């Protein structure tokens, strides 16, 4: 097992960031409510629901969008005009008023170091062996199958991708879907239904939450990555049984992620696996961010911990991160995969993956496995590992509060204040760095952050340059609260 670094505790930052956070929210909410009170007196139409109609929005969420998100929305949805590689061209936008739609200015694009995308292994490119194979596939297969996989839409590249994916992750068979989100939301209802129990990590992705709701079964949540609480929930659930009847559950399914995308944390798989075996539950792991990014051979969290993949019942992953493509997969025993081919909504009713995208994922996978006859895949994996740990260590030394584990390519940096979401994003753009800032509802209202995504395509020179810029920004807007102290750069 590889050594893991302890996760930073947000509670250790001291009282000042939290105090300023609540002051900022109080100021924003007070001003927003005052403005809307005056607006209602003036008869502003957007503040009144037409007579006889139900409101279209939940009031708090609508207020948040109008009075908070509206002021800082330029920090999101920035269009790019290039390949999403190590460096990207960002198209400038502007609006006359914060509440109005942002429009492209037509000005010169801004060349930025890309620290925001999921291009973990650097396969987002338009040249090289993988890109050449993709271009050739357009002439052979076209870009559209015109049908579902269950009918006549299963292309040769998709079939090959399913076979190679199963071999890569160490399972008997795999099924491929055209969309990562739909892989979870459409698969879970085919796995479990009435009489079953899902026990889900509290920070699981929205696609998993949607899939859980679609099953119609009982869903319980355990504290994030807390194996002790997971066991407590399982024990209590087994003792109580199903609601009202108290009959035994038909099955219990534990759902976790390999790497949690907003926290950068690696799941505590050894302890969770021991609990799964002890209580004879099933285990479903979403490896969207860990497959291709964790472990010496890139085989995800089971590779990272040295666990036999046969011990995991269901492995799910996506091709949208490390592989530079689209879509997702589920890998398991052949009998279960055959069941999904007939029962999963995302397989039966959705179009199959574009052959071109299947070739991209297939060829990237061959490179990672070394089946292209080169050591390019091994070099990419090592570069990603080295880059991630180098960037994490350097930015922590500067005094920033960061989350996550060693070896994770996802490195969240806590901003704490909603005003600093836009400030950090805008200052980074001025310094030619493209970053993703994250706030409510993707994170708790009190924990806004930025999320750096490291890539094998970054050089050490790229990262050193970015660290210098981020260091200056951290001093300018007071972000260095590591261990409860504000640390001025030396």
Curated annotation (Swiss-Prot):
This is Serine palmitoyltransferase 2. Catalytic subunit of serine palmitoyltransferase (SPT), which catalyzes the committed step in the synthesis of sphingolipids, the condensation of serine with palmitoyl CoA to form the long chain base 3-ketosphinganine. Belongs to the class-II pyridoxal-phosphate-dependent aminotransferase family. GO terms for cellular component: endoplasmic reticulum membrane; serine palmitoyltransferase complex. Pfam families: Aminotran_1_2. PANTHER family: CLASS II AMINOTRANSFERASE/8-AMINO-7-OXONONANOATE SYNTHASE (PTHR13693), LD36009P (PTHR13693:SF3). It is found in: Endoplasmic reticulum membrane. The lineage of its organism: Eukaryota, Amoebozoa, Evosea, Eumycetozoa, Dictyostelia. Pathway: Lipid metabolism; sphingolipid metabolism. Keywords: Acyltransferase, Endoplasmic reticulum, Lipid metabolism, Membrane, Pyridoxal phosphate, Sphingolipid metabolism, Transferase, Transmembrane, Transmembrane helix. It comes from Dictyostelium discoideum (Social amoeba). Forms a heterodimer with sptA.
